[in-house]
């Protein structure tokens, strides 16, 4: 008699995806982040569901309902801060996951990669709409500034902004629809994750060498389930440390002031995980140019597979490309820092130089360096 996990219609899908799945024997801890992202998503959906039970999406009561959750609902403060800081953990894992893909050439699986880029956009949209819901000062003004960017689109811009707002300014209609979309999108993301995995399992995982590992595979369970649990414990430890010791470390103090359309905060800035894109947006003096640069800063990931000129897939044996990769990483840290600074000398020029470097590395320097490495290896 065959094992039920191999014969039952539902159990065998789970079995072939998480238990008997053949995985390369040499994948490192950089391959942990996929499972961590899945756990982050589940955590966000669960905490979000319980928060939604107490939250009211009305401009008059939204701020007070969040206060009520923190003060009166049983362990409401844990739910609220797990959800807020869970988003930060989500983005840390996301950026490391994308970085791993860039370093080891995982983007050569184009379907998996492109769905991943769409997922990144979807998560960013969800996080942006979630930031609006507490209806604090930064919620209100952040939304006003970012949605207003769409007015830079020729002809339809102004109408589009008013259509998204549901009026002539960010108001009750905006808050209600953002709550609806913030609730809906994670479930769409979960469905897209399934498609992401479906395409990944068509090809199998990449590995640090970038060489096909078909001759040396091991079952996912128990080897990588145990390995992933270690990553999970480290992430949960970091998250709980953040939630229980300094839950507001990554937030903005301005968001503890109820939204006031008549009083603009001195420095409007998004959450830390959007600061690099915000810095790129601000580095271009033209509104439409800034918006295009903002979108391209993420959309550039789609053309990465087209710009792959190396004869090797991974960067493991390519020291020059490695230098560029870590320069890009440092550049992203610089952009994140600049995004949180006021628009004044010397931050403006640093932001502009960092933005130029960001696009130069990805579009020009990486492909040229790869060609040079091919030549040096006489390939």
Swiss-Prot record:
- Binding positions for heme b b562? 83, 182
InterPro entries (alphabetical):
Cyt_b/b6_C, Cyt_b/b6_C_sf, Cyt_b/b6_N, Cytb/b6-like_sf, Cytochrome_b, Cytochrome_b_C_euk/bac, Cytochrome_b_N_euk/bac, Di-haem_cyt_TM
The record's keywords, sorted A to Z, are: Electron transport, Heme, Iron, Membrane, Metal-binding, Mitochondrion, Mitochondrion inner membrane, Respiratory chain, Transmembrane, Transmembrane helix, Transport, Ubiquinone
Topology in the lipid bilayer: Multi-pass membrane protein
What does the record say about how the cofactor binds? Binds 2 heme b groups non-covalently.
One GO cellular component from the entry?
Answer: respiratory chain complex III
Transmembrane intervals = 33-53, 77-98, 113-133, 178-198, 226-246, 288-308, 320-340, 347-367
Binding-site positions, a ubiquinone: 201
Output the Gene3D superfamilies linked to this UniProt entry.
Cytochrome Bc1 Complex, Chain C
Q: Is Calcium there in the keyword field?
A: no
Q: Where is the protein situated, by its record's location annotation?
A: Mitochondrion inner membrane
One Pfam family cited in the UniProt record for this chain: Cytochrom_B_C
Q: For binding heme b b566, which residues are annotated in this chain's numbering?
A: 97, 196
Per the entry, which co-factors are needed? heme b
Q: Which GO molecular function annotations are given, in alphabetical order?
A: metal ion binding; ubiquinol-cytochrome-c reductase activity
| A biological-process GO annotation | mitochondrial electron transport, ubiquinol to cytochrome c
Family the entry assigns: Belongs to the cytochrome b family.
Q: What else is known?
A: Heme 1 (or BL or b562) is low-potential and absorbs at about 562 nm, and heme 2 (or BH or b566) is high-potential and absorbs at about 566 nm.
Q: Main role? A: Component of the ubiquinol-cytochrome c reductase complex (complex III or cytochrome b-c1 complex) that is part of the mitochondrial respiratory chain. The b-c1 complex mediates electron transfer from ubiquinol to cytochrome c. Contributes to the generation of a proton gradient across the mitochondrial membrane that is then used for ATP synthesis.
* Name the record gives this protein: Cytochrome b
Organism of provenance: Myotis albescens
């Amino acid at each position: 008699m065959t094992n039920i996990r191999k014969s039952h219609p539902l159990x065998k899908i789970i079995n072939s995806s998480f238990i008997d799945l053949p995985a390369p024997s040499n994948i490192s801890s950089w391959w942990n982040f996929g499972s961590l992202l899945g756990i982050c998503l589940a955590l966000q959906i669960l905490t979000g569901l319980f928060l939604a039970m107490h939250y009211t999406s009305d401009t008059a009561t939204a701020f007070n309902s969040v206060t009520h959750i923190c003060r009166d609902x049983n362990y409401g403060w844990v739910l609220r801060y797990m959800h807020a800081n869970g988003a930060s953990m989500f983005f840390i894992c996301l950026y490391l996951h994308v970085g791993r893909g860039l370093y080891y050439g995982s983007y050569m699986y184009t379907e998996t990669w492109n769905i991943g880029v769409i997922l990144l956009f979807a998560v960013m949209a969800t996080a942006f709409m979630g930031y609006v819901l507490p209806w604090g000062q930064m919620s209100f003004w952040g939304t006003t500034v970012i949605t207003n960017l769409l007015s830079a689109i020729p002809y339809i811009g102004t109408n589009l902004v008013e259509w998204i707002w549901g009026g002539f300014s960010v108001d009750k209609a905006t808050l209600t629809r953002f709550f609806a979309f913030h609730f809906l999108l994670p479930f769409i993301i979960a469905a897209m994750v399934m498609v992401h995995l479906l395409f990944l399992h068509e090809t199998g995982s990449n590995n640090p060498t970038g060489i096909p590992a078909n001759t040396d595979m091991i079952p996912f369970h128990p080897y990588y389930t145990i390995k992933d649990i270690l990553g999970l414990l480290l992430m949960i430890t970091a998250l709980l440390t953040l939630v229980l010791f300094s839950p507001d470390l990554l937030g903005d103090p301005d968001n503890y002031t109820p939204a006031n359309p008549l009083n603009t905060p001195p420095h409007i800035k998004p959450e830390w995980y959007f600061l690099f894109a915000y810095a790129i947006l601000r580095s271009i003096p033209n509104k439409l140019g800034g918006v295009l640069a903002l979108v391209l800063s993420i959309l550039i990931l789609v053309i990465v597979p087209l710009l792959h000129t190396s004869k090797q897939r991974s960067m493991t044996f390519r020291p020059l490309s490695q230098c560029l990769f870590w320069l890009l990483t440092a550049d992203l840290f610089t952009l994140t820092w600049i995004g949180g600074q006021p628009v004044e000398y010397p931050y403006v020029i640093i932001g502009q130089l960092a933005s130029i470097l960001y696009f130069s590395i990805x579009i020009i320097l990486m492909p040229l360096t790869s060609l040079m490495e091919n030549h040096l290896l006489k390939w």
